[in-house]
């Protein structure tokens, strides 16, 4: 084990000592406050991280971002077939616009869209 790290009895290192060691090694860590969501855009989809906790670690001038939160992947162009819209409209009795929105919100999942509209 590493000296001063604790390890015995489930005790960790003293936070002040850890901060001092990190400073000596040229490492700065800070939390980005009030982050609502983080979006990572790729060619095929957007990765949306909601309720995000973002930590920035700076080591020798390079920044590394650590993001923790609720991850959701959203396809960039979700084509909703007319038959799917019609089916949702027939099953739930809603307008075309409401059916289209429900399908978009469910990433094209018919059952999820119908359940969401039926329970609303």
UniProtKB/Swiss-Prot annotation:
Instruction: Give the top-rank taxon of the lineage listed in the UniProt record for this protein.
Output: Archaea
Assembly, per entry:
Homodimer. Interacts with the ribosome. Binds ribosomal RNA.
Name of the molecule in the record:
Nascent polypeptide-associated complex protein
Question: Which SUPFAM superfamilies does the UniProt entry name for this protein?
Answer: UBA-like (SSF46934)
Give the matching Pfam families: NAC (PF01849), UBA_HYPK (PF19026)
Task: Outline what the protein does.
Answer: Contacts the emerging nascent chain on the ribosome.
Which UniProt keywords are present, listed alphabetically?
Answer: Protein transport, RNA-binding, Transport
Q: NAC-A/B domain spans which residues?
A: 12-80
Which organism is this protein's natural source?
Methanosarcina mazei (strain ATCC BAA-159 / DSM 3647 / Goe1 / Go1 / JCM 11833 / OCM 88)
GO molecular function annotation: RNA binding
Q: Which family does it belong to?
A: Belongs to the NAC-alpha family.
Keyword NADP assigned: no
The UniProt entry's GO biological process terms, in alphabetical order, are: protein transport
The organism's lineage is: Archaea, Methanobacteriati, Methanobacteriota, Stenosarchaea group, Methanomicrobia
